[in-house]
UniProtKB/Swiss-Prot annotation:
Subcellular locations according to the entry: Cytoplasm
Function of the molecule: The L3 protein is a component of the large subunit of cytoplasmic ribosomes.
Keyword Cell membrane applies: no
GO biological process: translation
Gene Ontology cellular component annotations, sorted alphabetically: cytosolic large ribosomal subunit; extracellular matrix
Ranges annotated as biased composition (Basic and acidic residues): 1-10
Residue ranges of the region described as Disordered: 1-34
Organism of this sequence: Dictyostelium discoideum (Social amoeba)
Pfam family, one: Ribosomal_L3
Name this protein carries in UniProt: Large ribosomal subunit protein uL3
Record-linked InterPro entries: L3_arc_euk (IPR045077), Ribosomal_L3_dom_3_arc_sf (IPR044892), Ribosomal_uL3 (IPR000597), Ribosomal_uL3_CS (IPR019926), Transl_B-barrel_sf (IPR009000)
Signal sequence segment: none
Gene encoding the protein: rpl3
Coiled-coil segments on the chain, per record: none
Length: 398
């Protein structure tokens, strides 16, 4: 190929192989941030559900740039994060082969939403006896001593403590009834403090505001949109063949040499596209808060210092194919993996960011709450009524 006078780099990334369907529907955390025992005891991850996207307007703080102190428009993603429920803790010991599970302690009362996750078909299962034997330990003195002994053993021998928490899917407008379960590592403080923190939060809810904060960088772990079986043009981005090519254009002409007499794994082939497990690092939190009031008070989560309109984060008519966000939410810069309603795992950033963009404090000037179905650019129902007037069908008869 020495006669070539143009570049022809390979198409497609070999860093994500095999390109097959993910084994789990939710994002799996394979590593947590490094523990700093000088900090206060805290959780390092949470779970949420993708609601949809909108856009915001803000002033860019980037000295030296032509856009410094000028307005820019950015896309943001809204992730609804109902409170998570803590039901247990796991202690890990360090071995030559890595971390190994030492002991697991469960809470006394476990909801059916959590127990559904342990069954392939909860409806057809006749027994539903999961944890019935374990829970009886809390009813006897010997059982309580056994649980206390397990906690003491974890405090003495374990180096890593993680709580077991599950989402409350019944609070969302989803057809799913099985809760998503997640192990969340507890960082900060000594092992004794971590175990005491976990036990004190048994059968209690944890809010996302207690885990993350505004202007913080987090990692988003999830499964991408599924595209099904696709060809090499869409799957790998290779070049189409010339128009007069025999037996098809959207193919790879040469799939390798005669010998070795097998097709190399680096050759683009047709197959599964999408529904892959992916991790997106360092997504910035632009806003965090409660979407709708719980006690009847007015909450203006869509309000800014420059836009004083009383409105929530929800667009008119709700998010398309999702509905209204009612619980706590995160507003992240850019897009994240997966379709609407997809369960996402949110983790504190593994890497420490010291760049100017990472340390920039975000001040939003405007949050778009217009209809995502294409019904005009009106931000609230009052604006739309003021512009169009009262409809004839809604006007009262004299």
């Amino acid at each position: 190929m020495s006669h070539r006078k143009f570049e022809a780099p390979r198409h497609g990334n070999l860093g994500f192989r095999p390109r097959k369907r993910a084994a789990r529907h939710q994002g799996k955390v394979k590593s947590f941030p490094k523990d700093d025992r000088t900090q206060k005891v805290h959780l390092t991850a949470f779970m949420g559900y993708k609601a949809g996207m909108t856009h915001v307007v803000r002033d860019l703080e980037k000295p030296g740039s032509k856009m410094h102190k000028k307005e820019i428009v950015e896309a943001v993603t809204i992730i609804e994060c109902p409170p998570m429920y803590i039901v247990g803790l796991v202690g890990y010991v360090e071995t030559a082969q890595g971390l190994k599970t030492y002991k697991t302690v469960w809470a006394q009362h476990l909801s059916d939403n959590f127990r559904r996750r342990l069954y392939k078909n909860w409806y057809k299962s006749k027994s539903k006896k999961a944890f019935t034997k374990y829970v009886k330990q809390y009813e006897t003195e010997e059982g309580k001593k056994s649980i206390e002994a397990s906690l003491q053993a974890i405090k003495k021998r374990c180096s890593v403590v993680r709580v077991i928490a599950h989402t409350q899917v019944h609070k969302l407008k989803l057809t799913q009834k099985k809760a998503h379960v997640l192990e969340i590592q507890v960082n900060g403080g000594s092992i004794v403090e971590k175990v005491n923190f976990a036990v004190a939060n048994f059968e209690k809810t944890v809010n996302v505001t207690g885990v993350f904060a505004e202007n913080e960088l987090i990692d988003v772990i999830g499964v991408t949109k599924g595209k099904g079986f696709n060809g090499v043009i869409k799957r790998w981005g290779v070049r189409k063949l010339p128009r007069k090519t025999h037996k098809g254009l959207r193919k790879v002409a040469c799939i390798g040499a005669w010998h070795p007499s097998r097709v190399s794994t680096t050759v683009p082939r047709a197959g599964q596209l999408g529904y892959h497990h992916r991790v997106e690092r360092n997504k910035k939190i632009y806003r965090i808060g409660q979407a709708q009031p719980e006690d009847g008070k007015q909450i203006s989560t869509g309000k800014t210092e420059f836009d004083l309109t009383e409105k929530t984060i929800n667009p008119m008519g709700g998010f398309a194919h999702y509905g209204m966000v009612k619980h706590e939410f995160l507003m992240l810069k850019g897009c994240v993996a997966g379709p609407r309603k997809r369960a996402l795992t949110l983790r504190k950033s593994i890497t420490t960011q010291t760049g100017r963009a990472a340390l920039e404090k975000i001040t939003l000037k405007f949050i778009d709450t217009s209809s995502k179905f294409g019904h005009g650019l009106h931000q609230t129902a009052e604006d739309k009524t003021k512009y169009f007037g009262v409809k004839k069908s809604r006007s009262t008869k004299a």
